[in-house]
Amino acid sequence: MKIIGILGIQGDIEEHEDAVKKINCIPKRIRTVNDLEGIDALIIPGGESTTIGKLMVSYGFIDKIRNLKIPILGTCAGMVLLSKGTGKKQPLLEMLNVTIKRNAYGSQKDSFEKEIELGGKTIHAVFIRAPQVGEILSNDVEILSKDDGNIVGVKQGNIMAISFHPELSDDGIIAYEYFLKNFVEKD
């Protein structure tokens, strides 16, 4: 069974662990850089991207994650953290050649749920202060999902990033299955 790490310093950690179990993988909560050893993939969860970024700097995660050669899934704040820029000064991994519009849909009260397409399937997406891709910076970035023309899912190399929270909907498992099939098991 594949071991999927979930960055466990802030955000929706338990919900991601439950989803990883549903796709017959072993979740491993990542609290220190040493916990990165032995994982087959990494999930960077939603939460507050500035807080997660500062904690990643404090705990020494930035360079360690940048040097990983494994698939990475970023959800919501995870998408923000993987990006090249947000227009705001904050720690970023800068691994995904996109810029991000933070909180593109507005504040917490503007959060919503909507059906969108991902990998040829319809998924009930939960958008909570969700980002959108502002600009794609290289030709190897592929669009995975859109919401009314706005880019909310991309992939580049071994990285998948989505602006919604798959861990919060019953059929969100579709996103994890897509990640598993197209990234983790793609050898």
UniProtKB/Swiss-Prot annotation:
L-glutamine binds at residues 47-49, 102, 128-129. Its EC number is 4.3.3.6, 3.5.1.2. InterPro entries: Class_I_gatase-like (IPR029062), PdxT/SNO (IPR002161), PdxT/SNO_CS (IPR021196). Belongs to the glutaminase PdxT/SNO family. The active site is at 76 (nucleophile), 165 (charge relay system), 167 (charge relay system). The keyword Kinase does not apply. GO terms for biological process: glutamine catabolic process; pyridoxal phosphate biosynthetic process; pyridoxine metabolic process. It catalyses: aldehydo-D-ribose 5-phosphate + D-glyceraldehyde 3-phosphate + L-glutamine = pyridoxal 5'-phosphate + L-glutamate + phosphate + 3 H2O + H(+); L-glutamine + H2O = L-glutamate + NH4(+). Keywords: Glutamine amidotransferase, Hydrolase, Lyase, Pyridoxal phosphate. Catalyzes the hydrolysis of glutamine to glutamate and ammonia as part of the biosynthesis of pyridoxal 5'-phosphate. The resulting ammonia molecule is channeled to the active site of PdxS. Pathway: Cofactor biosynthesis; pyridoxal 5'-phosphate biosynthesis. GO terms for molecular function: glutaminase activity; pyridoxal 5'-phosphate synthase (glutamine hydrolysing) activity. GO terms for cellular component: cytosol; glutaminase complex. PROSITE patterns: PDXT_SNO_1, PDXT_SNO_2. Pfam families: SNO. This is Pyridoxal 5'-phosphate synthase subunit PdxT. The keyword Hydrolase applies. In the presence of PdxS, forms a dodecamer of heterodimers. Only shows activity in the heterodimer. Signal peptide: none annotated.
